[in-house]
Amino acid sequence: MKPLLNQKLQFSFAFLASLYYFFYFAGVGVYVIFMPKVLIDIGYSAVEVGVIYAAAPFVRFLLPFVFQHLVVLTSRIYFVSLLFTTLLTFLLFLTSDHFWSYLIANLLFGAAMGVSLPYVETIALSTLSRSHYGKVRLWGSLGFVAIALWLGSVLDVPMEAFYYLSGLAFVTFVFGAMLVRFDTIAHETTASNRSFSLRLYWAFWLSLFLMQVGFGGFYNFFTIYETAQGVSLEVIGWMWSFGVICEVAMLYFQGPLLERNLLTILQFATLITAVRWFLLYLFPDSIAMTFVSQSLHAIGFALYHTATISYIFLLYTQKKLAQQFYLGVAFGLGGSVGAIVAGQVYGESLFLAEAIVTLFAGAALFLHQKRKAWMTKDAQQI
């Protein structure tokens, strides 16, 4: 789709969206990297932390169904979600001494966070070229890395993490609110959203789900897996950083690749990700091969993510709802199931299992391609 705004407005949007992504994902970094340790430090058990962090993604999975049948993601709802995200960070702080109260506040916080990102992604896809989108989206990765490096070196008092979470949520609210005026997409209605169908392209959605299940072992156990091989935490930190550097590089230079067939790109990225997990299984104690596998994060995450949201944007008329379902099915349900499965199979064969799951994700994509071709052929014959 061609950009809908003139060059000056595109630049303004790109600038503000870059700031939104930077601070949004910096906040995600605080929430994902530091808050679990904070909860442990203030007296939560590992089981309680596990429940808290498994419940929030599941809410993100349920949220799109609410928007499909009851609510439409309008600019007003988006603005309210930004405001609530900020206010709920204070509620997290106030309820941190009580597990059940904190769990409820965390569920609401996860829901609010899950509303704003699909809204901005949809505007970005309708406003920017695929090449320009990557150069804007990479600021999210930079924000994530920046907060990890900064807070990792200065965080001495656990509760101070709440201050950073609130501050970043507020700055995200400020820049996010400025993006509303760039929303040129026709508003979806509850009636049109009800016609949205996961079953129509079920094999595609199954593939997205399985892909993130395959990432479960990496996100939750990569550090533990490598330390078990005798790799130091310092080296593991560099491994994580190297993967993000490769991710940022791909987001910046991926433009020409995205002019090709998006479904073919997804199939290629899924296959490469399976190879990545096989490398970790075959060479668990090789630092060099682990760095090679980390370089593939550029394809398995950065290229895959951009190709996915671009493909979904073309596949459905309900643009915002489709992006919400991507976040919910893949990172919500897939992330939750992936974490649980990885915990059950953790051991020497962890990444062999992840590779097999990812190969099934690739097979589902090929099935989707065949089904879509049949559907197109049948439509032409009518």
Where are these regions (language model features)?
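Helix-to-loop junctions at the C-terminal end of transmembrane segments
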Residues: 61-75, 155, 249-262, 346
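Transmembrane alpha-helices of Major Facilitator/SLC transporters
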Residues: 57-65, 143-148, 236-258, 335
